[in-house]
Amino acid sequence: VKVRTRSSAILGTICLVGSLALGPASADEPAAPKKAAVALTEVATAQNPIAGAAGPDDTVWIAERAGTVRVLTGQGLGQPVLDISAETTTDGERGLLGVAFDNDFAHFYISYTNLEGTSTIDEFAVQDGAIQPDTRRTVLTQTQPYENHNGGDIKFGPDGYLYIALGDGGAGGDPHGNGQKLDTLLGKILRIDPAGAEPYAIPSDNPFVDDPNAKDEIWSYGLRNPWRFSFDSGTGDLLIGDVGQSDWEEIDWSPASSEGGENYGWASMEGTHPFRGGTEPANHVPPVFEYDRNGLGCSVTGGYVYRGDAIPDLQGQYVYSDYCDGTLRTLKIENGTVTGQGDLAVNGGEVISFVQGGDGELYVLGLGGSISRIDAA
């Protein structure tokens, strides 16, 4: 079993040594990266925009929580190209929660909760930039015990596999212990190959394929509600914004060279802190960054490492926010260590998600309706 323990992570990649030895950066350890002067340019409004993905021909596809998908072009936001509003519910934290294209734009995927609250991943074929409705098929489902902590983000990694974020099942404090259990998909990042079989194949190098007591789909675990995650399009590193319980928000990091199996600690740990008397797991991979709820907000919204061309001073910085605060902030992460923190001095309102366009430029989605692009000031 290829479980990345703290010691194996050190042996497996030098770049993680700094973060494990020094511990994660936190909001009370300020350091300033290169200051980027930016502005938010509202390019469209939508009804509760909640997620998005870069589409073919320089488009950006926007998901609205109630179940519609619309395409953003230079001419604005078009009419819905997909509508599953009769098949989902927005009770609790449910709804249409994530969208993604595969790496050649041949298939489009949606992540949503159905009317029973079950987390569902569906696939559509795409032809000439258009969804083919009659090709729809369900790839994966996961029952949810409660209405919150659904996760729901989906992304294709640089390896061509589909990564799926699922929360711990909800309520509070992970009452079923799902975060640390390997016999459930809840509280995990999954890694599957939807093109490899029906309904999907398991990549042969997934970390738990040889463990009869673990789900083969699991890539990493110990997560509470990994609402938004992304891959650095420059390096392939994985960054996860995991929403905390009541005290600590965290951003987790793993290098592109990771073999998976990271245990991010929940619910034994909240960030680097024992949760309700918990004991730190021996294989705990601490967050690269954490902040408490007395300062920057109360619900982290993970973002992207900026790789666009419009704002040179922002190049290589991880842009993130917080739903309760809305300020756009940055981290400079080098070899798994935060070497700088910044404040972009702009506010996106109830920032629910970021979208990276095909050109590397970033869009900010405010649940109240705004779709804004981060531009040079």
Question: Locations of the language-model features?
Answer:
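Conserved blade-ending motifs and adjacent loop-strand segments that build the rim/top face
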Residues: 337-358
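Acidic, Gly/Ser/Thr-rich repeat motifs that build Ca2+-stabilized beta-propeller blades
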Residues: 28-173, 228-244, 248, 296-336, ...
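Beta-propeller blade signature
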Residues: 121-129, 178-194, 254-255
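Loop-centered beta-sheet repeat module
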Residues: 186-192, 205-234
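Acidic/polar, solvent-exposed loop segments in beta-strand-rich repeat domains
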Residues: 172-184, 201, 259
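Surface-exposed loop and turn segments in beta-propeller and other repeat-based domains
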Residues: 79-91, 135-150, 194-219, 265-295
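Short beta-strand-to-coil "C-cap" segments at the C-terminal boundary of structured domains/repeats
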Residues: 192-194, 373-377
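Secretory targeting and sorting signals
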Residues: 2-28
